[in-house]
Amino acid sequence: MMTIMDRSVLYQINSLEKPQKISGFLKEKGYSRQNLVDLRKNEQAICLNGTYVHMNHMLAEGDVLTVWIRETDNSGQIRPVKLPFVIVYEDEDLLVINKPAGMPVHPSRGNPENSLGNALAWYFKEQGVPFVFRCINRLDRDTTGALILAKNPLSAAILSVQMKKRQILRTYLALVDGLLPDSGTINAPIARMEGSVITR
């Protein structure tokens, strides 16, 4: 079990190819535009060699840069409900869980208390940590599998870009009916079942 409210990231500046501001350095590290906007709002978010500085400060070789990622959001509208789920992996930045089949990811008007969001709200409430629901990937209600959640704004930005660039690989297992050859490739879209917007 691991929790995190504010995340600090330390960078040792060993070498620089060219003179660079802190803002440019962080952008190269995967910080989103919104991440940088949030950092600029906090005068104690950027610490360089033990001194708080602004984002336009120039870096030099040998600098030690510490960035404080503050949690400002909250998914307090999601009702905490004690529901079972399995944690596959957890660290300061992300949580990977095995979503049970039959459980939707998000609560809805017709199902406000039996979703993964409710279960995670309970999980974080029990640890006294603000809950922000940041799903990186999606799974249908009846699909079980690994779901990635970002635990802070920086990891959300980095993981979202990786997902868009298809750098996060996903493998699906499916049940099929009938006799199939030992190997082969099906190169065709998976169509929806007639009369359904979910079943394929």
Give, region by region, the residue ranges found by the protein language model.
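RNA pseudouridine synthases
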Residues: 2-200
